[in-house]
Amino acid sequence: MSKENSNNVISIKGAKVHNLKNISLDIPRNKLIVISGLSGSGKSSLAFDTLYAEGQRRYVESLSAYARQFLGRISKPEVENISGIPPAIAIEQRVNTHNPRSTVGTSTEIYDYLKLLYARIGLTYSPISGNKVTKHSVSDVVDFIASYPDGTKQMILAPINLTNGTTPEQKLDSLSSEGFTRIELENQILRIDSKEIRQWLSISGAKLKLVIDRYNVSHDEDFLSRCADSVQTAFAEGKSTCIVAVFEDDKRIETFFSCRFEADGIEFEEPNEHLFSFNNPLGACPRCEGYGKVIGIDENLVVPDKSLSVYDDAVACWKGESMSEYKRLFIQHADRYNFPIHKPYHQLSEEHKLLLWNGNHGFVGLSDFFNYLEEKKYKIQYRVMLSRYMGKTICPECLGKRLRKEATYVKICDKTLPELVDLPISRLHQFFQQLCLTDYESKVSKRIITEIQNRLSYLLNVGLSYLSLNRLSSTLSGGESQRINLATSLGSNLMGSLYILDEPSIGLHPRDTHLLIKVLMDLRDLGNTVIVVEHDEEIIRSADHIIDIGPLAGRLGGEIVFEGNQIELFNAENSLTSKYLNFIEKIDIPSTRRKWTNYIEIIGARENNLKNIDVRFPLNCMVTVTGISGSGKSSLVKGILYPSLLKKMNGYGERPGEHDSITGDIHLLKGVEMVDQNPIGRSSRSNPVTYIKAYDEIRKLFAEQPYAQRNGYKPSHFSFNIEGGRCEECQGEGVIRVEMQFMADVTLICESCNGKRFKDDVLEVKYKGNSIFDVLEMTVNQAIEFFQDKDSKTTSKIITRLKPLQDVGLGYIKLGQSSSTLSGGESQRVKLALFLQKEQAVQPHLFIFDEPTTGLHFHDIKKLLESFNELLRKGHSLIIIEHNLEVIKCSDWIIDMGPDGGENGGNIVFTGTPEELAKYSESITGKFLHSKLFSTKLEK
């Protein structure tokens, strides 16, 4: 390869990480590259475990040994050679922080620029008068003096302040010794050494003013210089206060000037960056220390059901024989203050809620009630009662704003910083576009505002217009977190880097995909190499270069099936990706939709941005909840439906989101299951075969073998989790990890068992010539074939439990494969397989899936839909939150939310079948579904 070419490509030779089969390829630099292929084919092994791992390892190894000990240790990937690799940055689909101080604003650095902006051009307003707080300089006072015509009689005075322990007489003597000769007392000018003053001081408590200068206004330089000196002296003697008395038309007008930052008798703190930082003691609210929440009385525990009125026992702590007396007194006085005792709590105005909580002189409010319990908590019954209603609640001092009150006095265009960070990003972007500033403010803030607007634009372009900067990073979904990191990367303007992204389209509505593609192209155009592991059709078609890995998954994958541009991909015969893009393979639309009569209904859903909506979820069919990102899908399904059903059926669970009630045919369900993409186990000991309970039967089968029975081996001897049959040298791990302080840990195959995890005598037990280790090394497909034995009940049970793994498309994974190596999509399908192995339900379950197509290829989605249909055939019900049009078109019923995200969402746009939705012009989802649904039918 020529030197010129070597600089333009990343060359990989002999990559053998996980299932990669010694692959070699050249990846063009400064291009948008998509790596496609089935789930488990080796995409992440190439992108993250090979390219990113090597790029990061080389960077870390370039640092000193001292610096390396503080960084995560990265092992060298199993590859012969990689050349031409730039510094690598991985943006994965996971929430990287659970820090309660981390917000969207801080992670994107927009908040840092906002702090700087408020420190530079923010204006402080007095909370008492609402007037702007100003600090006068000497030149301000001189300009005021010079604003009068020549000859105007004026006088510069300074108030005389007595320090502790100083008498008026002592102060006058001190001023006299400094060279001052006159003071003003009750509008009379008197000499300091006159006897008259001493008499006045003994009689009157009148305030003294020191006469600094008397003059007639002139506009020559000498006069203005004299005034400046006098004003300087007045500020020094008057403790930062200066008075200019103007005599005009037989009137005396006094104007006060202060070089202190004060107004209405309050001295304010001058705006600075630290004042607006909730991570700094100078800016954080002293009560909650910048968290926005404190441990206190939780409103949600005091009023658990907000659909009830005070009369109907909405207040949980005012129930019971003795405590109901407080409720009776409140109701007795309610009429006097026009409090609506029959109105549901959630409909009460803020004024009425304050009355309930703070009470009045006529009755005790909830706050006083809990203060009383606090005083009596030395008694066990009061202590127990108080603990029932304690939880994390909004800080009463800063009201969740995180900053001390002084920071809220500073405004830009009538907006405080906490008000700005609470706005959705779309409205915040609009605010900065319409910002009206003075010429001076514009010059000072031009660069800061440019940086803010650029970063806000990137967030809008990745489909996050509905988020606010105050949103906690820990509450974001994996897709949202990834797109925020992507926007932050664009804002940093890095060049010459390798960006590796894991399915950035997760959680993104088809409407916003083209915006994401533009962001990826912008990142490329800055001079970066952008590698995206992706299944989205539109993103694949937009790539400069496509690498398709396959042909299938697991041991049947790990090969480069195709490498080239989009046009060349259409002619790739072995590529499943090509077949689906060319419509040679496709996911068929169901010929009929399932009818439903039973349902679960949520009434008055108000959580987050939901607009008090009523929703019916049909049972015994496949229901898909769709809508723009941020339209309220998760709030409705995961925030209200799931916890409400869990609490109703089991009596426990997280607090459901705000709603009136949940009704319908709940009695027809035995349980509710949330099937998410969280790992099924994080330890190296956890594996799919133990999760689906097939390993219990395999161990039992080996314990039944003659050699095992002769030696008294029980099923526990074939477990690598407990002592008995496992190798004690490696404790059943098969490997021994040697910790290296400055380098990556070295993993060595256990010399005692040669990586086979069990003792030699246990490995002597064979079934059909294979040991327990040999069985764990088999794939699901191989194991099903191996255990075909019609005469054995145990092998029948094993096959029954393994078959669902094959049905959900996981036939390629090894039985003993560590769960920590499974992708999110694979973990979700393992969970699905566990339910599929159960026989037809006597009392069916409701299964809830949140974007089950994450990480799935078209071919994987086809198998997933077959599994869904199998669940439905067994009498279960499905509710799916999804953006993928292949799943939406195969649904029986769709609940479309919107019309947009954030504050413009939270409504039900449409409910009905896919065909009806595709014809509904008001739905954004419907417009995209129309082309998918009817173009596919035309092809048929």
Where are these regions (language model features)?
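Conserved phosphate-binding elements of NTP-dependent enzyme cores
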Residues: 1-940
